[in-house]
């Protein structure tokens, strides 16, 4: 009868509402790729993924997960990964190794994950997270060259000597060179979808675009044995470039050469 149908519809609505609420009671948070949130220039083509779960109830147990990786943000946001999709049972959420199609150097990728609880309820997809690979092959650096300050004839500048603890250091000393600075102008005439800068310096450097320092790091890059390896730092400069003229600048420091 009509009354029974109303109660049936109401019961179904309550069940659907309860199931939807239960799925929202837990979610994936704190995503990490190679221990970092949205890392730039990772030095591996088999990155590892980790995450945590925020749940209303104590004692939450993850029973399964589904992880996707792709090169299109919109597709991953819609739950589609064209490079890798894995679904596995278990509570693993640390260091899940990538095992999909081969990744390429210097490209940006996107990933997301969702999990199930012990009752078989599934969380929403995690907000899309990104990572980019570094320049890991020698060919990727084929167009790069070292830039150095030219030695000037008057590079040896003499200044008056000083006394320290009443001991004369000398009549003359050699003053150090000023910090070398390099600049280059580029012209941007089309909309920029993505722009990366990979910068290295023997010693330390600071990188500038249009007069503003890029990044908040200090004493880049990491020290290394320059006879064996030289480190570099990746910067996402997509939002730094403007239409028209742009000025790129680098200021160098002695770094380990001053030790």
Predicted regions: what is each one?
Residues 9-18:
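Bacterial N-terminal signal peptides
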Residues 51, 89-90, 94-96, 107-112, ...:
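Accessory beta-strand-rich segments of carbohydrate-active enzymes
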Residues 1-7:
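Positively charged n-region of N-terminal signal peptides that target proteins for export
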Residues 30, 48, 62-66, 194, ...:
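Exposed beta-strand and adjacent loop surfaces of beta-rich binding modules
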Residues 60-108, 114, 118-126, 139-152:
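Recognizes extended acidic, P/S/T-rich segments that occur
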Residues 43-44, 100, 105-106, 242-243:
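Surface-exposed loops/turns
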Residues 134-172, 251-259:
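An acidic-aromatic loop/edge-strand motif
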Residues 23-58, 128-141:
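Pro/Thr/Ser/Gly-rich low-complexity, intrinsically disordered linker/stalk tracts
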